[in-house]
Amino acid sequence: MNAFTNNASLVIYPSNPNWTPDNPEALINTLQKAGLAGEFLKKDKNSFLVGEKFLDHISFMGCSPNIKLENEDNDGKFTFIQITITETITALTGKHSFSPHCPHCKKPEKNWRELLQDNQLTCNQCQTKSDAWLFNWRKLAGFGKCFIEITDIYPKEAIPQPSLLDSLEKSFGVSWGYFFYHA
């Protein structure tokens, strides 16, 4: 499933795929207080400009990342933050997601796209049926009900600082991770 409309994103999400904030506004306030998220984007109450401390929380790889933090060209191709909360566990896999590795036998499941049903996968190697999020997706797919999407970030172009993930865990009592979504 593709819940995102952006081509490439860094996505931060809770390790428990069933977790959602009791109050979504608390998540927004936490991100704004930390300076990761800034002002709301126009009428959308789930999208934000990056905050004043965005670059303190996200580390860019390489010596010269080419990111736009403002919509200078009015084309919508710039880095902003979007929060997505769903009622059911959502699988976010792009066409660039690699074969995940089985949590039991550790072998790759090459036919995962055909086998993924109701967020379950059965390994063709060992025949073990598992929740899909237990497979090792190598940070190229994720499952959950709550996602913090940082748009216009390509795979391995940037990563969240551990201090940001620790702050989210301290605020909400659940550990957080990240993955890259690339349509």
Task: Give residue spans per PLM region.
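A composition-biased, non-transmembrane "mature-region" signal
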Residues: 31-37, 117, 122, 162, ...
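A structural detector for beta-sheet-dominated domains
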Residues: 70, 99-101, 151
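Cys/His-rich short segments
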Residues: 81-140
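Ampiphathic alpha-helical segments that act as solvent-exposed interaction surfaces
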Residues: 20-37, 86, 95-104, 108, ...
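Long, charge-rich boundary regions
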Residues: 131-183
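N-terminal alpha-helical interaction blocks
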Residues: 1-89
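His-enriched metal-coordination microenvironments in redox/metal-binding proteins
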Residues: 1-9, 114-118, 142
